[in-house]
Regions:
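Conserved non-catalytic scaffold segment of RNase H-like nuclease domains
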Residues: 2-104, 118-136, 140
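Acidic, Mg2+-coordinating catalytic module of metal-dependent nucleases/exonucleases
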Residues: 75-85, 89-94, 124-186, 762-764
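Walker A/P-loop
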Residues: 252-273
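Signature of the SF2 helicase/ATPase Hel1-core->accessory helical subdomain module
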Residues: 380-406, 411-509, 571-583, 714
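A contiguous, basic/glycine-rich beta-loop/short-helix subdomain that forms a polymer-engagement track
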Residues: 380-402, 421, 507-615, 619, ...
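Conserved motor-coupling elements within RecA-like helicase/translocase cores
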Residues: 398-404, 659-683
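Conserved RecA-like P-loop NTPase helicase motor core
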Residues: 608-616, 671-766
Length: 807
């Protein structure tokens, strides 16, 4: 095992420290370390990273003085390193200049870890050590890193030894996807492996699956909420208990009810425990706004309920979230030339021995493989000729959904399923958490989206087959307009050009008579609004979307036999606009648990920050970035909540320090985990970060809101509701848009108030909150829940310092 510390990671790097650990027969038998004099001063960040100093290295030997010793240690072995390319190449180069040729086989523990621990999101040595419980006392010290790499290799060997010999054989067949000679480790374990299969696995068509465990007999919950909480080893909280009591009363008496309660009181247990204790015969369906929260509930509250009360809990998502085994099996028969895809298939083979659900979200770096996943995702169809009829994950999930006691899903899947089959929730209790968010999910049912590049691909195919010259010209014209749309959208040029192009598409499609284009003809010739957007995946596809007129009410999808409980921290919109009305339940019972002012939360309004509506994006982003640099000096977690992707990316580009940014560093779930683990101090987020992600691990969080979260009046749902309210003689801004902005701000405050004694300070930089008439309404509402102060920008550091000293 070799680890080098160097002056840089570039081609001119010089070795400053060497660490070597020797393994024989699965045991560490020797180790060696030495500093090396690079004869040049170290950069400040290298000193900070390694703890080495120029003075110390000045006393160290030259590499020529230790080269023989190093070569003797590594000459006859396999060269193993974490990111072997850097260490092996640098050492080989330095040894070559001293007359020694390093030609050892090379093994990279990074790639092996990626294959055999597919659920991890990061594979740096410190993170792997933390996740696997490997000691790493002094990261970026050569010997310490080499020892940790040795322990990691032993851990990997142990993991491989637990796998069936047949699986190792298949992995070896694909091991040319690994760099260098990393396959040697798998080969050694394979040679020594017995043919006996694990009793925990079942083999089907050469694939190995984890056997499903038997469902435990559920334990009876008490009617006393405090007893159930105590059994979960949690403290009883007064407001949580009050909330649970109200939920219990609503479940006894009300067919449809809405309950509002403040963040941070433990609402999830507050509604689940009363529901589970009362609904002895009926299934409970819980819907949450996002898949992230769905996963979070399964990993946290759901896991505890299973452990303590043996509740049969299942998470149900759309079919595309699951691996389609028939498609994966076919891909294994193909000799794919893409090395990354072959390695991904190796990961999937290992993952199949561990997963019980087949939910692709379990794979840590899934975003890296989006290009390969289109053909592997489940489409919801299962052929009667399937080789995996029993093991099919989507089929299993559907069956579990019918029999489990508590079914957890998300708003998007819920409304889609209800549209197809309202009986999905018949005679069940439906709990909708963050119920106001289901309005957007309902609106999305009316939207239709097409990928422009996919349309172009379809046109190219049709042009090769179409014989009619007139129709050929129409196809060519449509293709030109599609390419023009992409060009105009990417360049950010005149909106008029895009509108003209859409009008041309409307005309061309109305004249198109080619078979296979009927759906697109209907789509482009229908009356309605269209808009272009970029997908938030690694492929950045440009899509065109449209929406139908009118709104779908939740009440129109849910059968009367279903009892409905809507929950949120923010249900009240305004005196003249009711969420119950917007959902189609004007008679719903409404209960409110008063929030009360939180002593651990402060909102700070910056009265002299540049006015966002009169400042260019570039200038405003620079001001925000400069402020963040001042705030980061306090060494506290900073969550920045943006209303615009463009602003977020502009600030990210200007920040000179390492940070996490949505749209750049993985999906929301991964960013949340990395931020909670303290990988980076600053997280820039938008969209789901306002209301769909909770942060509970940090005792103190600084939140920054660069712009008030008003909804875009051109968004389809907002536009429709505004039109409805105007027709009813109401003021769309004061009765809906302003209250919704206040709701979103309150939800933002709740992101970092998830448990008792957690503290947060929120900086609102948009000075409209102190300069506009409506700002008083926002401040008055926030002041009911947190301390609100107004300061100058020059006083920000002082305000943070004061708040920190109160900890």
């Amino acid at each position: 095992m070799v680890d080098l510390e160097a002056t840089s990671t570039g081609s001119k790097a010089k070795i400053i420290q060497v660490g070597i650990v020797v393994i024989e027969d699965g045991k560490i038998v020797d180790h060696y370390t030495t500093d090396v004099n690079p004869h040049e001063p170290l950069d400040a960040h290298i000193k900070e990273l390694t703890g080495l100093t120029d003075q110390r290295l000045a006393q160290a030997p030259d590499f020529s003085q230790v080269a023989r010793k190093i070569f003797d240690l590594v000459e006859d072995g396999i060269f193993v390193a974490h990111n072997v390319q850097f260490d092996a190449n640098l050492l080989a180069e330095n040894l070559f200049f001293e007359g020694y040729e390093l030609r050892n086989p090379r093994v990279d523990t990074v790639e092996l870890a990626q294959v055999f621990f597919p659920e991890l999101e990061k594979y740096s040595l410190p993170i792997l050590c933390r996740e696997l419980g490997i000691p790493l006392k002094h990261a970026h010290t050569a010997l310490s890193d080499a020892q940790a790499t040795a322990e990691l290799l032993l851990f990997l060997r142990e993991k491989m030894a637990q796998l069936p010999k047949g699986l190792l054989e298949r992995l070896l067949e694909m091991a040319d996807a690994l760099l260098y000679e990393s396959y040697l480790v798998i080969e050694e374990i394979y040679r020594n492996q017995s043919i006996l299969n694990s009793s925990d696995l079942v083999q089907v068509q050469g694939l190995y699956f984890k056997k499903t465990g038997a469902t435990l007999e559920p334990r009876k919950l008490s009617q006393d909420f405090s007893k159930n909480i105590s059994l979960l080893n949690l403290e009883v909280r007064e407001r949580q208990e009050s909330f649970a009591k109200e939920v219990g009363l609503l479940l006894k008496d009300e067919p449809v009810s809405l309950i509002q309660a403040p963040t941070g009181i433990g609402k999830t247990y507050g509604y689940l425990l009363p529901a589970l204790s009362q609904m002895k015969e009926r299934q409970i369906v819980l819907s949450v706004p996002t898949k992230i929260l769905q996963n979070q509930i399964m990993e946290e509250e759901g896991k505890r309920l299973e452990e303590v009360f043996h509740i049969d809990i299942h998470s149900l998502k759309g079919p595309q979230n699951y691996l389609k085994l028939d498609a994966f099996y076919r891909s294994l028969q193909e000799n794919d030339e893409n090395r990354l895809f072959r390695r991904f298939k190796m990961q999937l083979l290992v993952w199949l021995t561990e997963t019980e659900t087949g939910d692709l979200d379990e794979i840590g770096q899934l975003y890296r493989y989006q290009h390969f996943l289109a053909d592997l995702r489940h489409d919801g169809n299962l052929s009667s000729q399937s080789l995996f009829m029993t093991e099919d994950f989507w089929k299993r999930s559907q069956e579990r959904a019918q029999t489990c006691k508590l079914l957890v899903t998300n708003h998007a899947y819920l409304v889609t399923r209800l549209e197809d089959n309202p009986e999905f929730v018949s005679d069940r209790l439906l709990i909708i958490d963050e119920v106001q968010k289901i309005l957007l999910a309902l609106e999305n049912l009316l939207q239709e989206t097409h990928d422009i590049q996919s349309i172009i691909d379809l046109l190219d195919k049709a042009l090769l087959e179409e014989q009619n010259k007139v129709q050929q010209r129409i196809l060519e014209s449509i293709r030109f307009e599609c390419l023009y749309l992409i060009e105009q959208f990417q360049s950010g040029k005149s909106k008029k050009n895009i509108l003209d192009s859409l009008a041309n598409l409307h005309q061309y499609f109305s004249e198109l008579k080619v078979e296979g284009f009927e759906e697109l003809v209907r789509y482009f010739t229908a009356e309605g609004d269209y808009w272009l957007e970029t997908t938030e995946t690694s492929q950045k596809k440009i899509q065109i979307s449209s929406t139908k007129s009118g709104r779908i009410l939740l009440s129109s999808l849910v059968p009367e036999s279903c009892q409905v409980l809507g929950v949120s921290a923010t249900l009240e919109i305004s005196q003249r606009v009711s969420l119950a009305d917007l959902l189609g339940y004007p008679e719903a019972k409404f209960v409110k648990i008063e929030a009360g002012k939180k002593q651990d939360q402060e909102v700070v309004l910056v009265k002299d920050f540049p006015l966002v509506t009169e400042t260019s994006l570039e200038v405003y982003a620079k001001e925000v970035a400069d402020l963040l640099m001042d705030v980061q000096a306090f060494q506290q977690p900073i969550l920045v909540l943006f209303t615009s992707k463009d602003m977020l990316l502009a600030v990210s580009d200007l920040l000179p320090v390492s940070h996490l940014a949505q749209y750049k560093n993985g999906d929301v779930h991964q960013l949340k985990k990395r931020f909670e683990k303290g990988e980076q101090q600053i997280l820039l987020g938008a969209a789901s970060f306002w209301e769909g992600v909770d942060f509970s691990s940090h005792p103190f969080v600084i939140q920054v809101v660069p712009r008030l979260p008003f909804q875009n009046p051109q968004e389809p749902l907002t536009k429709k509701i505004n039109q409805e309210l105007n027709q009813e003689g109401k003021n769309a801004f004061y009765d809906y848009q302003l209250p919704m902005a206040i709701i979103r701000l309150k939800q933002a405050l709740g992101r970092s108030m998830r448990r008792e004694h957690q503290r947060s300070l929120t900086l609102i930089l948009d000075r409209r909150i102190v300069g506009k008439r409506y700002g008083k309404q926002i401040v008055a509402s926030l002041a009911k829940e947190a301390s609100v102060t107004t300061i100058a920008q020059s006083e920000v550091n002082e305000a943070i310092d004061r708040f920190l000293n109160e900890l």
